[in-house]
Amino acid sequence: MSEVITITKRNGAFQNSSNLSYNNTGISDDENDEEDIYMHDVNSASKSESDSQIVTPGELVTDDPIWMRGHGTYFLDNMTYSSVAGTVSRVNRLLSVIPLKGRYAPETGDHVVGRIAEVGNKRWKVDIGGKQHAVLMLGSVNLPGGILRRKSESDELQMRSFLKEGDLLNAEVQSLFQDGSASLHTRSLKYGKLRNGMFCQVPSSLIVRAKNHTHNLPGNITVVLGVNGYIWLRKTSQMDLARDTPSANNSSSIKSTGPTGAVSLNPSITRLEEESSWQIYSDENDPSISNNIRQAICRYANVIKALAFCEIGITQQRIVSAYEASMVYSNVGELIEKNVMESIGSDILTAEKMRGNGN
């Protein structure tokens, strides 16, 4: 004989009216069913409001008071409205609206490019395109020569000789403060002051996050793709080449046999860091940069602008593909014309669809 189990709803939660339970693990099936049905009720209540829903400022998001208000929302007359144009995001019971376009929101571990905005007491304020300036502490930078020691008062007096207002640098987001501003560091030699190149800017939403944001490109050019949408194009240096070689992964130098049979030692990455660290704060650009390098930098900058114009996510592969597609135009200035940018963007998307990895 089977027993009929009925479900009744009381005070917003479901309860089992039967006393029948199977206590195999110390928790009754009735309690599990009650929790499952309750969660289903919460999910179905917001079924009409999809997580991918796009809302506009002033639009009603939900009238259910169960949700906690997050960024991009405001509360009025027991109802939650959107304060920005964006997509609705729900994490547990936190309801927020992510803007379609807006300022960069830093996250720990982000590789960013910034500009020194102010020199203060043992710190620099850096513009990274966010709602607030980031902070770079004096203790978070490498000193010239690569010497690891405590920062002294003399170092504080020489802060402007290291980095001054207007200088560009790439850094990593070390942590976030309570107000959402970022704390940066440049303790690695892959970070620091930027020289011998050109700056360009795209919306931060177009930068595809990856493990590495510094890439060596054809034409002896290196690109630094800041997650914040700030991009730096420069002539490839010895340090950039060393990171792409097997010796960059070993602290000791690697022996190799030359064509004459003699054994030679390739310089290790550590030695290159020591030599380059004396010039990391120099204001002088390399005078030997040729016109071909300058033209290649401008071509890369224009194809990046073309990708941004077509709202295509920017990656190393797409930059190289766009660069190759742009070679049919001998005049670099033509690349920023509307029809040319649309043509390059169309070629990139078509090539990716042909390869079967179009997004």
From Swiss-Prot:
Note: Present with 4840 molecules/cell in log phase SD medium.
Keyword NADP appears in the UniProt entry: no
Sequence segments annotated as region (Disordered): 242-266
Every S1 motif domain range: 107-187
UniProt subcellular location: Cytoplasm; Nucleus, Nucleolus
InterPro entries reported in the protein's UniProt record: Exosome_cplx_N_dom, Exosome_RNA_bind1/RRP40/RRP4, KH_dom_type_1, KH_dom_type_1_sf, NA-bd_OB-fold, RRP4_S1
N-acetylserine, modified sites: 2
Assembly, per entry: Component of the RNA exosome complex. Specifically part of the catalytically inactive RNA exosome core complex (Exo-9) which may associate with the catalytic subunits RRP6 and DIS3 in cytoplasmic- and nuclear-specific RNA exosome complex forms. Exo-9 is formed by a hexameric base ring of RNase PH domain-containing subunits and a cap ring consisting of CSL4, RRP4 and RRP40. Interacts with LRP1/RRP47.
Summary of the function given for this chain in its UniProt record: Non-catalytic component of the RNA exosome complex which has 3'->5' exoribonuclease activity and participates in a multitude of cellular RNA processing and degradation events. In the nucleus, the RNA exosome complex is involved in proper maturation of stable RNA species such as rRNA, snRNA and snoRNA, in the elimination of RNA processing by-products and non-coding 'pervasive' transcripts, such as antisense RNA species and cryptic unstable transcripts (CUTs), and of mRNAs with processing defects, thereby limiting or excluding their export to the cytoplasm.
Protein family according to the UniProt entry: Belongs to the RRP4 family.
Residues where Phosphoserine is found: 28, 268
Compositional bias ranges of the Polar residues kind: 246-266
Keyword Nuclease attached: no
Gene Ontology CC: one annotated term: nucleolus
PANTHER family assigned to the protein according to its UniProt record, in alphabetical order: EXOSOME COMPLEX COMPONENT RRP4, PNAS-3 RELATED
Keywords from the UniProt entry: Acetylation, Cytoplasm, Exosome, Nucleus, Phosphoprotein, RNA-binding, rRNA processing
Predominant location category: cytoplasm
Gene3D superfamilies for this protein: 2.40.50.100, Nucleic acid-binding proteins
Pfam families: ECR1_N, KH_6, RRP4_S1
Protein name per Swiss-Prot or TrEMBL: Exosome complex component RRP4
Organism for this UniProt entry: Saccharomyces cerevisiae (strain ATCC 204508 / S288c)
Example of a GO biological process term: exonucleolytic trimming to generate mature 3'-end of 5.8S rRNA from tricistronic rRNA transcript (SSU-rRNA, 5.8S rRNA, LSU-rRNA)
Domain of life: Eukaryota
GO molecular function, one term: RNA binding
